[in-house]
Structures are given as C-alpha cells and as structure tokens.
Amino acid sequence: YNSLGPDSKDSELFVAEKLDNIRKIIAKIICCKPEEVILTQSTTDGINIVANGLSFDNTSNIIIRGMTHEHHSNFYPWIKLKDRISIRNLPIDDNGFFELDDLKSNIDNNTKLVAISHALYNTGSILPIEKISKILDNEIPFFIDSAQTIGCIGEHDVSKLKCNFMSFNGSKWLCGPMGTGLFYCNRKSSELLEPKTIGGESAIIKNDNDLIFKDLPDKFQTGFRNYVGLAGMESSVTILQNLGLDNIRKHIMELSNLFIDEIGKIPEARVFGPENENERTSIVSFEVGKNDPEKIVSALAEKGIIVAKREIYEKPILRISPHVFNTKDEILKLVEELKKL
C-alpha cells in the first residue's frame, strides 16, 4: 500500500483523479484555486490547522464572538490558547450579532486573527462577513467557519469575502458522507501556518536533515485516507451544483418561511433568530411552551420526523434545518404534530 491505497496503477490513478476532481468542484463553488482546497475529516480539522499553526507571542491577541453562543468547534480551539495569548470576545445580541464598532475597538497592532462563524448553528443568523473583511482590510488574518453556509446560502466567492482561511463540512449542507471536510487556505496566507502534523505527503528532506514543507495542498494534507467518503461527497456536490445553489437557497427559504408562518399560529410557540430572511439561513430554532425539547424530539422521531435539540445561551431549544430534499407537505405535517403537543 502507498498513500493512495493499494500498489496498483489503476487504483492510484482512480484515487488521484477523485482527489483532483473534488478540489476542482469545491474551488468552483467558493471561487478559489484547486490547490487552495485541503481535504480534511471535518470543519473542526480546519479550525485546528489554523489555531495550532499560527505563531504567537505573549503580546498577541485574537478576536472571537459569542463564547457560549458559539459552536464548540469554533470556540474550544481558541480558548485553548488563552494561557499563551489574549482572547478578546465580542459582546453579542440575542441573535448572535455584534456591533462592528466593537470589532474596530478591539483591533490593535497585536491582533493576529479574527475568527468568526459565517452563519450560526443555533439561530441561523448570517453574519456580515464582507463588512467584517472590509474592516480588517487584508491587514489582519481572517478565519471563517462556513459549516452552516456552504451549500445553503447560494454562491460563494472567497475573493469577495477576503478571508485567509475557511473551514466547512462535507456532510452537512453539501450532503456528503460523515468524515468529509474542506479547508480553504489562501496560497499566500499558507505561509502564516506551520503544520502540526507531518508525513511523507506533506514534506521532503534536503541535505540529510532539513525538513522542507511542500506547496499547497500537500503541506496540510497529511494522513487523509477517506477516499470512499470523498467519492460520495463528489457525487452529492455534483447533484447540488446541477440543481443550482441559488435555486436551493430559494427553495429552502420558502420552506423556512412557511414553517415560521405556520408555527406562529400556535399561541405558546416562540421562534428565535432574525426576522429578516436575508439575515438568516433556513435554520429555524423554536420552542413550544414549556414542553421538554428532548421529549419533543423523541415524539416526532416516532412519527418519522427528525428535528434537533440545540442550545441558545445554554437554553435548550428545537431546531429544524430544511434542505433541498424537503417539501412543503413535510413542513405542514411537522406543524400539525407540534399542535398536538
């Protein structure tokens, strides 16, 4: 066996073609170069590549938002650094938004990174990434957790978002298998990161003991072996592309808005998140009176309806995240079951 599987030319060429093709597909979706796409196991992998790869000193600081309102994967890796650097947390409102002036006031000459989720896993709020990048003005490295946006809010263009790094998942909105993820690393910005995992794919030895990292994507590609998952993600993403990402956005927002309208007819129901549909994904978080979210999840599962229990400020709530395969009839069936509670 070698890094691409069995020692077979046919197998090696097949896997290499899959690797090359998925990078081209993702590069087209986010408007970058194929070599800037690193294959990972999850969004979390990409976040940790950045958190563990940047160089800091004792005067350094990074800026995050939300703390307990943030997804753990885009919170814990930064908090782990708190004994080495200053972690500056932006105050937020009930929907997870922060004031841009607060971001400006927290930036100084020692700010090494701003790390922000593009959209929030609990409220569905879409943060103003382009306004944030304009403030940073290519002077401060910018990391975006796009796990909740790639595949559900239409076309992306990293050149407009002006981010240095972006991580997202293959098994959420891209509908691929578990264990698939993508990490975008701007070619020039790759010089800011030192890999913390090294293997034969990522480096070479010169002059007997001088370790030289390879160029992108190999520099960060150590140990990836989920070729079966990769083939599945290639198929799922191709289907989404054929449907059209903007068409998908239109469809799922119709479902989301339908649910909000219908659940609003239940007196004890409450919906969380922005009212303006341009400020949110199709995610809808809600509660139905004092009913236990865990019990509701179980009751609906018995009816063949899958919803999730999540948290907003450590408060348990229910969440739906309709996607392209869902229908209006399914939304109406969900609401009818909620009325029976």
Sequence positions of predicted segments:
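Pyridoxal 5′-phosphate
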Residues: 1-341
